Structures are given as C-alpha cells and as structure tokens.
Amino acid sequence: MAYQEPNKDGFYGKFGGRFVPETLMTAVLELEKAYRESQADPSFQEELNQLLRQYVGRETPLYYAKNLTQHIGGAKIYLKREDLNHTGAHKINNALGQVWLAKRMGKKKIIAETGAGQHGVATATAAALFNMECTIYMGEEDVKRQALNVFRMELLGAKVEAVTDGSRVLKDAVNAALRSWVANIDDTHYILGSALGPHPFPEIVRDFQSVIGREAKQQYRDLTGQNLPDALVACVGGGSNAIGLFHPFVEDESVAMYGAEAAGLGVDTEHHAATLTKGRPGVLHGSLMDVLQDAHGQILEAFSISAGLDYPGIGPEHSHYHDIKRASYVPVTDEEALEGFQLLSRVEGIIPALESSHAIAFAVKLAKELGPEKSMIVCLSGRGDKDVVQVKDRLEADAAKKGEAHA
C-alpha cells in the first residue's frame, strides 16, 4: 500500500484540513512555507540530528523486556525507551524540531500548551537552549496535578499561565494558546505538542516524532535478525508518540498497529477519553477529527487518570488509520493502567508514565493472545517520576476503601 498522506490541503483521507479564522490562516501558511523550505535544506536536518544525538541522547534503546515477557508467557515484548530521552519523554523530539524551525523563521517568542506538563517542560527546555522567550498555557486542573512539572518549567525560564476557562484541562490550554498566537503572530511561534491542530501541524509533529519508528525498525532488525515485528502498541491521547512509532511501518501491512486509548472509569460511563471508541467526526482546534461530543455537537469533557491523555479529540491521521482499518484503537481503564504501572515497575525495574502504562496494560493482554512465537514493539513514551505521588495517593485511597468495605 503506497501511503502519501496528507494531500496538499492537509487532509488524511477525509480528516484533517485547516479550519481556522483568517487571522490565523496567514500564520499557518507562513509556517507551511518555512517547513517545506527546511525539509529541502540538508543543513536543517543535519543540525537537528546533531542536537538529537548530543543533547537529547538519541538513539533511544529498543529493550527486550525479558522479565515481562516471561511473566506473561506470551509474545516477546520490546520496549522503545523514549523515557530515556532528555526531559523524560518523547515530547522533546518535536519541541526541539519546532523551536529550531521557529528560530530559522526569525521568531522571538515561543508559546505552547501542555497537559501532563511533559510537552511544556520539553518546550521550555528547547526555548532555553535557543535563548527564546517562552510562555506555557496549562489548565488549572493540570497545574494542580502536575506541580512538579510546573516548577520545572519555571526553573527553565518559562512563564506558566494557568487557564481557568472550561474544564481547566488540556483542550482549554490549547484554546488559550491559539488565542495568544492570534494576538502575537508576528514575533511568536506556537508549538503544538501533539499531532493535531490545523495543517501543517499534524504533519510537522508526525515527521519530528517519526524518529521513534525509524530507529525502532532498524533496531528490531539488528536485535532479532528478523525483518519486522508482528505488532506495535502505543498510548494515544492526541497521538504523537503513537504516530511517531506507527508512521514508518504504515506500508508494512503484516504489522498490526494498536493505539491504547484512555477509558478512564469505563467507556460506558461519562468519565473517559476514548475518542475512537466513542467519538464521531467533528472540528476541534482547527482540524476535522474524531471528537467526543454530545447529540448537539458540544464537545464533551474528557477524563483520565493521566493528564496527558484527557483530550476529547485525536490527531487526524489516527482518525484516518482507524477509518481505513490500518490501526485498531482499544480502550484501557484507569484501573488497568495502574496495574500496568505497577507491573512494569515490579518486574523490569522501569517506572513508566501513566500515559505509557495504558500501552503496557494493553500489551500484556495482546501478548497472551498472540502467543510466544510472535513479537511486538511497545512505545514507552515517558518515565513515571511525575506520576509517583499521584499513584501513591490513589493506591492508598483504594486500600483505605477496601479496608472500610471489609470492616
């Protein structure tokens, strides 16, 4: 299957595009022009590759999780260790690329949104490296959940704006960042943290994150002597780590691709963020994608134990993969993610981010189904340091509830 998405208008099949007001159209067209020029300039990629090697610490290892594999007794599990990047997650791949692009465009200021804080930290890090002014928009609810990352961003010289509109989470931070961009378009670049938003953002983010899948593909061959794994698994909120892993394999049809969505308290409750399980097409933040919405088209509140997954939409390329049945998207509950978090910590000595724990939880199920002759690559998108206190509080609260029930 030849795969050449997006088309010139930024559509992936019927998803994507750029649904933005005139005030933003100039900026996205300017960005697309600058991005095309950078793609055609070998020195841009050379400089970026050097930064990824020397500053970020790429390439990240592809690690055979022998203990986890033996514990489950199913397919071989290989972890793509994005948690070992500088700043602790995959977000730096995109942040560094976009700040370097903004610098080339002559921009002086950087703005970004963040949910779990990882994209905010990565953007603040890249802005510090390139000596650029940086403001991060973060929902007030997430500011509380991720106090440590807020301090990190401020330590790196960024200003953190707590957003008090709406549900005070990621989608509200995106709204605030877009408003700020409209007001300061001449000297400011907006760094979207996931593979969504108006074209060319989904393509730019995908391209900068595709280093994950390109490395993993070659590493798998070097490690196993086999051509391709049987499956790929990654967690999906907006979907940037997943698209980064999936895209280099999209034409390899023997490789099954699975995105683990946040099912929160369950997809049959109102408390989840399982966009492809329960959503339908709609326009959000400048792009046509699957969106959680009510019968009147009002955007529903997304919910997840993981701040990085509670977004009510999903990148348009994921909507397209789902539509053409190239990838499957599966719901994983908070409870299952917590089990994955503890299991990987216990058997491999690796504490994963709550986001990545959704992928681990599904990988455990899939490994049992596939059996020991098969193999899979799981994107370990980030480390769990930021989540340890939250998990501790949650597990203690759960234990107290159980104690009361037995009393």
Swiss-Prot record:
Cofactor(s) for this UniProt protein: pyridoxal 5'-phosphate
Catalysed conversion reaction:
(1S,2R)-1-C-(indol-3-yl)glycerol 3-phosphate + L-serine = D-glyceraldehyde 3-phosphate + L-tryptophan + H2O
Q: Which pathway or pathways does this protein act in?
A: Amino-acid biosynthesis; L-tryptophan biosynthesis; L-tryptophan from chorismate: step 5/5
Give the top-level enzyme category.
Answer: lyase
Q: Could you tell me which Pfam families the record lists for this protein?
A: PALP
Gene3D superfamilies of this UniProt entry? 3.40.50.1100
- Keyword check for Lyase, yes or no: yes
Alphabetic keyword roster: Amino-acid biosynthesis, Aromatic amino acid biosynthesis, Lyase, Pyridoxal phosphate, Tryptophan biosynthesis
One GO term describing the cellular component: cytoplasm
InterPro entries found in the cross-reference section: Trp_synth_b_CS, Trp_synth_beta, Trp_synth_beta/beta-like, TrpB-like_PALP, TrpB-like_PALP_sf
- UniProt GO molecular function: tryptophan synthase activity
| Residue positions where N6-(pyridoxal phosphate)lysine is found in the record | 91
* The EC number(s) this enzyme carries: 4.2.1.20
Q: Which PANTHER family match?
A: TRYPTOPHAN SYNTHASE, TRYPTOPHAN SYNTHASE-RELATED
NCBIfam families reported in the protein's UniProt record:
trpB
Q: Can you tell me which family this protein belongs to?
A: Belongs to the TrpB family.
Quaternary organization = Tetramer of two alpha and two beta chains.
Question: In UniProt terms, what function does this protein have?
Answer: The beta subunit is responsible for the synthesis of L-tryptophan from indole and L-serine.
Q: What is the name of the protein in this document?
A: Tryptophan synthase beta chain
Q: Which organism is it from?
A: Streptococcus pneumoniae serotype 19F (strain G54)
Write the lineage as a comma-separated list: Bacteria, Bacillati, Bacillota, Bacilli, Lactobacillales
